[in-house]
């Protein structure tokens, strides 16, 4: 049980910006909302089905047709995304399919949302960053991730800025190139990207139409030492932009699963998922995504995900999935953020900004005092994908997760764990080198502690190989 007094949080999750997760009803046999709950959030005209291995293609087609479905799309081995005919409800189709012997499982196509928050302020559009160390407390402050020393560590290892490691950002897209109505963010290098894909528009141009994905990618690999803007933690890593969320920051589980498999097949070493499903979505509701996450682990790809912003003592999926790094959010004061989920399965925390949670006995927490600063990065200053700056501070576990993804990229580049560390080795290293917070006794609030990029990339220590 969490030690947090949730009745005295400074700001409820409902006050987060529109990309905060919606509440979703749990499924029993069919997608029916629980009494008093918000209706389930899933695609209204499509479902995901997995057939048993021995089922013949003709039999699969007949089963789908009998359920009122058509236009099957292959998403994974033996798995199909089915479009429902007009007048056929998701519940009716699922009832028919779940009674068939050739169907392993059938589920709605649940939607996830970006796990970030935006608090408007009057900073003004397009203003210069000034001294990055004054603004980026999350990198160099007392409760930052110790970026300067981490940069020195990996430079000494011949891999400055995590050079060469590919990090896939599965999000709203990234402002990675200038073409048509889109413009590359002025604080991204044109050489900092590898080929991505847009699973919303179904083309090879994963442009951002929201700003959330550009922010996340900037925390990982913003151009650094270029006399402009801010810095990126793994500034020489390559970003693979994969668009799985639409302009509202929403995307279905099947789309996210496709994005995960794409990233694995195209050379990503780390995948960042700054998104969350509603707290009511369970593992049984998103089997295709869990299979994709297992596919990533089996191919040696580390997946990092946001723990969620509902101030609940439960980690949201996909962060809750096995072997996924679940990242909570901490504040500038070294306290758990008031919106951050916590509980069993939390791996560690990273800077997410905002106000302190009300944690009795934690000397770093002052829920009644001034809120800590938010996290800053260069992204859109409005709705136009051509205007950039630091429009306001973002806060959320979305902002926390890329700190961990970037640290993992630095570990890989440093070679401290060998040439190709496994996800399990990377997770063990991240946990073993984290800074203890809150007294260090109860992992339900902070996991192993605050991610420390310097300690994680230093020579020697847990799991290090002889040089």
What is the predicted role of each segment?
Residues 264-278, 287, 292, 299-301, ...:
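C-terminal subdomain of the subtilisin-like protease fold in secreted/lumenal serine endopeptidases
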Residues 34-131:
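Primarily auto-inhibitory N-terminal propeptides
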Residues 77, 98-166, 174-187, 197, ...:
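Protease zymogen maturation seam
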Residues 49, 82, 103-106, 150, ...:
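Generic structural signal for small/hydrophobic residues in well-ordered secondary structure
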